[in-house]
């Protein structure tokens, strides 16, 4: 029996769902939780798939599960198969005359806070019957979500070329790093230096994220380091609440606090920045066919930019 024929007879949807979940989540543990499976059961299914394909699809290590080149290639096909099945299912349950358009957006937490409120308001003036699903996630999760078909539109950062395969990127703006505090913070009563700032409790993004890399670069450029007693979180809402209500110093991308700075809810410390800023843009799949709702959402994001 030919190898391709054997593959097509033995491949199952559970193999594709498992593979796509691991690609999206980045670790076997998180993928197992998403699929409500035990990790050994998920590992067994993944091993079966690699035996069927005759290729190693992931490199497993301390950093999680990273797609290999054959894995990247297989992901494109796996997503198309699952998309086709989902589309077929939706077509069977769609009621004639009803608008069932759903637009799925994945955004960096700071981008969601800084960009999306006004965008969503504008969007729903035109698309009152469209369901808008918004998830905040890290940049690797946005890229994986686009490739696996979990989201239609991403608002995030350009990544390494091998991770951008199959994706389009459209620059929106450059985002600088700000150090912000509440209006009556004691630091505002003195000449501020970075070393003095770090004597106060700080809120930063977790290690491995772009905002954290920029925060580390800033403090290291002045011979300092982020204190061990810091708060690490991806939650922009939690970070904002800690900063508004207490004496925390928040290391935050500028887009997330532009309204707070304009209304003086938060104040930026006069600490010199480091670097030119981080490019934030719209991410989509190269082979995507957009619904009218998706296209209107993209247009609303573009129109929200101040240029």
From Swiss-Prot:
GO biological process: negative regulation of DNA-templated transcription; regulation of DNA-templated transcription
InterPro entries xrefs: HTH-type_LysR_regulators, LysR_subst-bd, Tscrpt_reg_HTH_LysR, WH-like_DNA-bd_sf, WH_DNA-bd_sf
The HTH lysR-type domain, residue ranges: 11-68
Extent of the signal sequence: none
Listed GO MF terms: DNA binding; DNA-binding transcription factor activity; sequence-specific DNA binding
Keywords linked to the UniProt accession: DNA-binding, Transcription, Transcription regulation
Family to which this protein belongs: Belongs to the LysR transcriptional regulatory family.
Protein name: Uncharacterized HTH-type transcriptional regulator YdcI
Gene that encodes the chain: ydcI
């Amino acid at each position: 029996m030919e190898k391709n024929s054997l593959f097509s007879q033995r491949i199952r949807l559970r193999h594709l769902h498992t593979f796509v979940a691991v690609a999206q989540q980045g670790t076997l543990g998180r993928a197992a939780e998403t699929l409500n499976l035990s990790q050994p059961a998920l590992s067994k299914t993944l091993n079966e798939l690699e035996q069927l394909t005759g290729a190693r699809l992931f490199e497993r290590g301390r950093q999680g599960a990273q797609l290999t080149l054959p894995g990247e290639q297989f992901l494109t096909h796996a997503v198309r198969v699952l998309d086709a099945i989902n589309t077929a299912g939706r077509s069977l349950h769609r009621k004639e005359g009803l608008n069932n358009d759903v637009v799925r957006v994945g955004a960096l937490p700071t981008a969601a806070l800084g960009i999306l409120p006004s965008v969503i308001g504008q969007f729903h003036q035109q698309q009152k019957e469209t369901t808008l699903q918004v998830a905040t996630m890290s940049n690797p999760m946005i890229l994986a979500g686009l490739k696996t078909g979990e989201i239609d539109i991403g608002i995030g950062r350009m990544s390494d070329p091998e991770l951008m395969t199959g994706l389009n990127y459209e620059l929106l703006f450059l985002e600088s790093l700000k150090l912000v505090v509440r209006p009556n913070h004691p630091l505002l009563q003195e000449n501020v230096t970075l070393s003095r700032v770090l004597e106060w409790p700080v809120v930063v993004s977790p290690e491995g994220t772009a905002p954290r890399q920029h925060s580390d670069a800033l403090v290291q450029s002045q011979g300092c380091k982020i204190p061990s007693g810091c708060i690490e979180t991806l939650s922009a809402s939690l970070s904002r609440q800690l900063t508004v209500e207490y004496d925390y110093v928040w290391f935050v991308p500028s887009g997330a606090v532009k309204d707070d700075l304009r209304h003086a809810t938060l104040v930026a410390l006069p600490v010199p920045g480091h670097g030119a800023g981080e490019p934030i843009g719209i991410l989509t799949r190269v082979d995507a066919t957009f619904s009218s709702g998706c296209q209107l959402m993209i247009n609303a994001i573009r129109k929200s930019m101040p240029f």
